[in-house]
Design a protein with these regions (language model features):
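Bacterial signal peptide processing site
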Residues: 19-21
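Short, glycine-/small- and polar/acidic-enriched structural segments
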Residues: 24-158, 167-175, 180, 191-196
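Pocket-lining segment of extracytoplasmic ligand-binding domains
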Residues: 84-85, 163-261
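Secondary-structure end/capping motifs
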Residues: 230-314
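Long, low-complexity C-terminal extensions of enzymes
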Residues: 318-326
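C-terminal motif of bacterial Sec signal peptides marking the signal peptidase cleavage site
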Residues: 14-17
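Sec-dependent signal peptide recognition
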Residues: 2-8
């Protein structure tokens, strides 16, 4: 009888051990270690991804059209690009992505080089814009319908030397469409030929609210998730999005955290090479009432659909399609 009890106890122990082992195996199997491949513009949108500076799967690009091209090809799991550019790629080029969130809300400005004697922007002034047919161009034409752009350059980084010299192709430039944090850098660069005479002429977000009301907003850089990636790795994607939301909230309320991440990454030159700006500029724009208008609006938020549709009804109503939201 004693031997039977020992055998029964041993059997229970073995079964229990097997169950634990099986549980451990299942837990290990359920863990998803998939690494997201991410691409974003430099400058303002990249501020939201400072925790990914050392991630080899995170890529930045200075030209939004290059990012849209990658989106159409489906090369990345996560694409950060302007709202209009991304939705156009989905609607017109069948890019297999969905809109997950919006992270900047109008960081465009007009910079006066000081060359215009009356400092009143008019149709005969020489005006330079970046991103032809993209968000800055569309917004400028909407906000200033009677004033045209004379010259276009590819990205906002191409605007900086023009704004600081006040010239393009040896001709005087009167006004530049620019974005924060590039504007901060231009205004504070003592080596710029326009230093001391150049100034912020107009804030697109303020102008927008003047026309459409204080509750309305420009919608800028947005996060798009590849359909296949979300289907196969939804937990990884949701974790990523939650982390970005938390990080942005931290950077806006505690700019020193953003500064610390950049300074730990490398020298000012290395920082600028990675995301187009450095910790000094980050400090300036985040502490200056968050002039890059960094924030987070999720496609799961109750106000998302109405906010996006209100904006698109003004700039491009053909892009409205709830099926394109995550």
């Amino acid at each position: 009888m004693k031997n039977k009890l020992i055998s029964l106890t041993l059997l229970i122990t073995l079964i229990s051990g097997c169950n634990k082992s099986s549980s451990n195996i299942n837990s290990s199997e359920n863990k998803d270690d998939y690494k997201l491949k991410i691409i974003s513009p430099t400058e303002a949108p990249a501020v939201g991804l400072l925790n990914y500076l050392n991630d080899k799967n995170y890529e930045t690009n200075t030209v939004p059209n290059n990012i849209v091209a990658e989106m159409i090809k489906g090369t990345h799991d996560v694409v950060i690009v302007d709202l209009i550019g991304g939705l156009t790629a989905i609607n017109k080029k069948s890019a297999q992505y969905k809109l997950a969130s919006i992270i900047t809300f109008g960081n465009f400005y007009i910079y006066s080089t000081g060359n215009d004697s009356n400092n009143i922007m008019e149709s005969d002034d020489n005006i330079v814009c970046f991103g032809q047919n993209n968000t800055p161009d569309i917004l400028f034409n909407h906000l200033y319908p009677n004033i045209g752009v004379d010259t276009y350059v590819a990205g906002v980084s191409d605007i900086a030397p023009i704004a600081m010299s006040g010239k393009i192709n040896n001709e005087n430039v009167d006004y530049c469409i620019i974005a924060e944090p590039v504007l901060f850098n231009v205004l504070n660069n003592k080596n710029a030929l326009t230093y001391g005479k150049g100034s912020e002429y107009s804030n697109f977000q303020a102008k927008w609210k003047e026309i459409h009301g204080n509750e309305s907003s420009i919608l800028g850089a947005s996060i798009y998730i590849k359909n296949e990636t979300y289907q196969n790795h939804s937990n990884v994607v949701n974790s990523f999005l939650n982390n970005i939301k938390s990080d942005i909230n931290t950077y806006v309320n505690n700019p020193e955290k953003a500064i610390e991440l950049l300074d730990n990454y490398g020298s000012k030159e290395e920082q600028a090479q990675r995301i187009g700006l450095n910790s000094t500029i980050i400090k300036g724009v985040l502490e200056d009432s968050n002039s890059i208008n960094l924030g987070y609006l999720s496609s799961k938020d109750s106000s998302f659909n109405s906010t996006v549709e209100e904006y698109l009804n003004v700039v491009n109503s053909t892009l409205i399609n709830k099926n394109n939201y995550l």
